[in-house]
Amino acid sequence: MALFEAVEVTKQFANHLALDKVSVSIPEQSIFGLLGPNGAGKTTLIRIINQITGPDSGTLWLNGQKLKPQDVVQIGYLPEERGLYKKMKVGEQILYFAQLKGLSKAEAYKRTKYWFKKLEIIDWWDKKVEELSKGMQQKAQFVSTILHEPKLLIFDEPFSGFDPVNASVIKNEILFLRERGATVLFSTHNMSSVEELCDDISLINRARVILQGRVDEIRNT
């Protein structure tokens, strides 16, 4: 069963066609790779899923229902342009975002502590974001993305800026989240990450889907 579906989604900005009747289907509890070069349309599709912008035509479905604005709480989004407030303390900021997504203060605190310990950033709780390395900041934003345990997780180039050790840590956590029931969409141009993680892929180029299917089947064709 598909957790998320986009059916013939089209989006145009002025004279630029960003998406041309794009359809994707993401199976529940899977890791789905959205591949393509810069400007292919990947980020536009992600923004439409997150209700940052709307399609000109086409339909989006989440869990068998048409996607509605209030469904955004069921989505966790890690954008390529990271967005933590530099002057705010790390722990305080993650708690704030968690409560915006519907968690009680006590539950937000418990989950944040768990993930900070797991990712070995607990010592940075009271540090300002600007005091953290880029990798540490990305770990903190990763925690913010997953903390409310959304049905659909969207990661846009999640490994950019990580050294190989920390990239491996995050890859393992993404696999762990899938085992716990999450459905993951991640956008990348890195084929090796796709082969390591993804069950299914969709390749977008010049606003259109040009290849889609199971990774193991595509690899063997």
Residues covered by each model-derived region:
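Flanking scaffold residues of small Cys/His-coordinated metal-binding clusters
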Residues: M1
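ABC transporter nucleotide-binding domains
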Residues: F4, K11-N205, V209-L211
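Short acidic-hydrophobic catalytic motif
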Residues: D216-T221
